[in-house]
């Protein structure tokens, strides 16, 4: 029998500093329906900046 699809969705976290750097991660759509914003390190400018969620194409 086939396994049911999970609630987890792959997302891309894009730097708000417009450097083009991004992280990929997963999030649970049911527990967190809003867009994710998290502060992470951007190695291009060597600073902590806010990363915003974007869909993976």
Swiss-Prot record:
GO terms of molecular function: structural constituent of ribosome
Q: Which InterPro entries match?
A: Ribosomal_bL33, Ribosomal_bL33_CS, Ribosomal_bL33_sf, Ribosomal_zn-bd
| One of the record's GO cellular component terms | cytosolic large ribosomal subunit
What are the boundaries of the signal sequence? none
Give one Pfam hit by family name.
Answer: Ribosomal_L33
Entry's Gene Ontology BP terms: translation
Alphabetically ordered keywords of this record = Ribonucleoprotein, Ribosomal protein
What family does the database annotate?
A: Belongs to the bacterial ribosomal protein bL33 family.
Q: Mind telling me which PANTHER family this protein's record contains?
A: 54S RIBOSOMAL PROTEIN L39, MITOCHONDRIAL, LARGE RIBOSOMAL SUBUNIT PROTEIN BL33M
According to UniProt, the name of this protein is: Large ribosomal subunit protein bL33
Species of provenance: Shewanella loihica (strain ATCC BAA-1088 / PV-4)
Name the gene behind this protein: rpmG
